[in-house]
């Protein structure tokens, strides 16, 4: 029951994840492992240091993990940020000006996921 509450709290897609991971025990296991993932920290520190390649990697990884675990709002926010940070051939982010606008949504969604996992 706490899994349903956690996914409802974060606006996640539990039914799709159940099809992918098959058991609630596996979903709980991987959700808790997510708390050890360093993609958000990588993203934040890379943005602070101006390392856009590493920032893109952090956002892209966060996007993939959140998609796989059905953390829908985080996936959507990380997807938009990842697209903005995608580097062109010259190594310039696609839409660097959008990053300050997009980052708060990623932070908020990430915090919500972390808080929701605590319910499990």
For each feature predicted by the language model, list its residue ranges.
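Intrinsically disordered or compositionally simple regulatory linkers and C-terminal tails
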Residues: 1-5
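N-terminal helix initiation/capping motif
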Residues: 6-11
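Long, amphipathic alpha-helical coiled-coil segments characteristic
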Residues: 12-61, 93-120
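Short, well-ordered alpha-helical segments
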Residues: 51-56, 66-87
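Alpha-helical linker/edge segments of TPR/alpha-solenoid repeat scaffolds
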Residues: 89-91
């Amino acid at each position: 029951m706490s899994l349903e509450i956690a996914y409802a709290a974060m606006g996640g897609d539990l039914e799709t994840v159940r099809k992918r991971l098959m058991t609630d025990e596996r979903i709980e296991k991987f959700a808790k492992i997510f708390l050890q993932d360093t993609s958000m920290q990588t993203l934040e520190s890379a943005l602070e240091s101006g390392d856009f390649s590493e920032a893109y990697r952090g956002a892209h990884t966060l996007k993939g993990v959140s998609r796989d675990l059905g953390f829908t709002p985080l996936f959507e926010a990380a997807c938009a940020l990842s697209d903005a940070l995608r580097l062109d051939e010259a190594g310039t982010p696609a839409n660097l000006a959008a990053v300050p606008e997009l980052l708060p949504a990623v932070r908020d969604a990430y915090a919500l996921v972390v808080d929701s996992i605590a319910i499990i």
